[in-house]
């Protein structure tokens, strides 16, 4: 049985993406499990109904943008409108909201915008299923989500709202494509691409997860197509080197993932002459270049391998071996890159009938086509050194190829053990390199290759150019026209946007392997802008990751009509001070956005060189230890949670359950506990009797000290994103304030008003409806979101008293305010004199008393 987590300090532990939500309901909370009698009519439904329309009318989160305050920009990864908001959204968006509200209270001019990533395949599939146009489903969902955003009290500037499927947005997506095209960064080429046989569209390398389509899970195949690419590889070094600016501000896990994806490695290009073959263009001896990080092991190369799906394999194969190669290619074409590189998989290959000549010793190396070699790594060909590479060794043993050890690592002979000798060692069987260690041998080998003109030092990258083309409808059309006379012709800027036709719907959008746009003759057939002759539009649409690579720039000036964004506005706001979103976007979206900003910087459109100064990855919302899903039947409906417990209780639970980066298991939290705590906090304001504006300096010093310590610690904790600890400390302040009202300094003491105002300000970050009502009850005329974070009096931070916990047999029975310098004997005496302790003991004797002055006493009865 899973035990619900209550709201004790012990429950503060180390919080996203949930799943599933039914259609939005705008009903207020109807079943809040709060003891209404005890908490004096805390009615969260009425409170929500009171404040939501007032907030909407005031648009209190629109920035001034007049230079009167220092600017801060907080941005959430915008949602895809696939339905209503779900539990994952609830956790993710509250994190950015906490940051934005806090910065506003601290006096910054805060930009916190909202929008939708509204192009994409789900809308197209929904339109096919519903016999509709994708826009109908998309914009209906956007309106539903927008209503939920407002109800959920996310403090954003609604005047900056955008959707990437709006023509006035994708006009600028197309405009940016053309600027990349002019710079040589957008180009088209024929190449093997990842192909999803279910969605019938191509996928970027980053969209293939463990050999399957990231969206539908179908195993991905390879297909030769003429496709559009962005030349992101031109920026590989800058993308890698500029990560130094992000150290300490981005999660190290994300930086490591990007470093690995870019995959920079130092080594050498080595030229191998193909025996008996001439270059078709030059007539000279045919050469094939390979990349290796270990040129020092050249003497150990015993065969040459080419990727089975590389064009090079078809070029090198002899006519006698061509049929065998074709049959092999057919057998392996359905294997993913991941499967092909699995270490425990049987190695397969075909001899191509030719030999490559080792440039360092003239040895003839048989050339094989192999599926463990990838076409898009290096040049698609490798020199195989089986003694010192396990996959090469497995292949050599499978086809009875020689194994020659050239590195003495102290390990047994790989030819006998079947285990490659890897790592550092001393070169052997390597001619003039004998006796050299790896660090000396690598540059020596490169020097030798350079002298004989067959190699040079180089850098290789795992990163490949970004595949942009999609053979689907619901995306921005590629703004290129194809003319038989002029070739590729960019659509003139004054003809942008190239709008999507509005007459396609339902089955007309069904995937056929070519874009549905190709079927609309009056859209496809146009005059060439250059020569006026008959021409056709490009029928592919642009990868939706392009839309999301620059939306945060559009937020800075969404009404700007002279470009994708106003350069002056972007200069004022960029880069984003706090970006919030899931770690699943570490490579795709985040890497692409970094690439875009660097190109725009080079184009002179943007001063920023990085899009996001700081990144916060929230965790996942689980249920019963598993991700929520329809198949598991463990989904939690967000709207039902909001109706039952109230918005504030759900928000507070999300924040209190764990630090933002950790997962939240909804089966193990207590939104009802959150609601009860909020009712207690709300009740405080009903009991304050001092007038607004009273000088708190005349109030109870002990309570004031707790209030100011809470404010001081909360500020540091919020900066560190330890929101759950802030909530815990606010709970302590509420409890201490209640005790002060009931049995301490009393409700009229100015320190009580100060404490309750502090509670309202802090709670406005997490539970804005309740905080707003507390603030108004205290007599304030303006919204609490427009208040200021209270100034901390440092003189009150020096503790003269502390709360000592008194336990009886390990259970807390009383709390005592005691001097910080109290002795153990004094604390023991006070604890034993407590009326609550005496009542608990009920005449029993005492076995022992454990004292840890000034914080703890534990009494063990006899």
Curated annotation (Swiss-Prot):
PROSITE patterns: AA_TRNA_LIGASE_I. It is an enzyme of class 6 (ligase). It catalyses: tRNA(Leu) + L-leucine + ATP = L-leucyl-tRNA(Leu) + AMP + diphosphate. One of its GO terms (molecular function) is ATP binding. Keywords: Aminoacyl-tRNA synthetase, ATP-binding, Cytoplasm, Ligase, Nucleotide-binding, Protein biosynthesis. The keyword Nucleotide-binding applies. ATP binds at residue 630. This is Leucine--tRNA ligase. It comes from Renibacterium salmoninarum (strain ATCC 33209 / DSM 20767 / JCM 11484 / NBRC 15589 / NCIMB 2235).
